[in-house]
Swiss-Prot record:
A single cellular component GO annotation: chloroplast
InterPro entries noted in UniProt: Thioredoxin, Thioredoxin-like_sf, Thioredoxin_CS, Thioredoxin_domain
Role noted for this protein: Participates in various redox reactions through the reversible oxidation of the active center dithiol to a disulfide. The M form is known to activate NADP-malate dehydrogenase.
Keyword Kinase included in the entry's annotation: no
NCBIfam families in the cross-refs: thioredoxin
Domain of life from the UniProt record: Eukaryota
Subunit structure and binding partners: Forms a complex with heterodimeric ferredoxin-thioredoxin reductase (FTR) and ferredoxin.
Keywords, in A-Z order: Chloroplast, Disulfide bond, Electron transport, Plastid, Redox-active center, Transit peptide, Transport
Organism: Zea mays
Protein name, as recorded: Thioredoxin M-type, chloroplastic
Span of the transit peptide along the chain: 1-53
Protein family per UniProt: Belongs to the thioredoxin family. Plant M-type subfamily.
Localisation per UniProt entry: Plastid, Chloroplast
Amino acid sequence: MAMETCFRAWALHAPAGSKDRLLVGNLVLPSKRALAPLSVGRVATRRPRHVCQSKNAVDEVVVADEKNWDGLVMACETPVLVEFWAPWCGPCRMIAPVIDELAKDYAGKITCCKVNTDDSPNVASTYGIRSIPTVLIFKGGEKKESVIGAVPKSTLTTLIDKYIGSS
């Protein structure tokens, strides 16, 4: 049965003028009638499924640097959560999955960015980042809050809710 299904799928997706030949010992291939339930017309008429309704919602953490900082953070209409981190920092690796979850949970309500302090030291020094991880909240291009260290998700959600509630 599994082999027959495999051949059905192969026959359905094989190019019409394919010169490829399937060499199988003394195996009996399915008849044309066995291929009938898998009509190509029925498969091709399926309507597309929309997974995400909002094209502008970003559900992942965006990498910010000196080049795109103004466009991503300063000009953003929604509140922006920015994590300052470095690849060698253990606590930064601990908080990274939390920031990823927040980006998914608050997609369309906030923008989550991360800045590698090794790659963008000028951005970090502009905002007085001396310890990492540091999370800053921006709203309307203005720094509103900062949290230093690897904090629990609940701390960050409370902070985010404070700023998306006052939009």
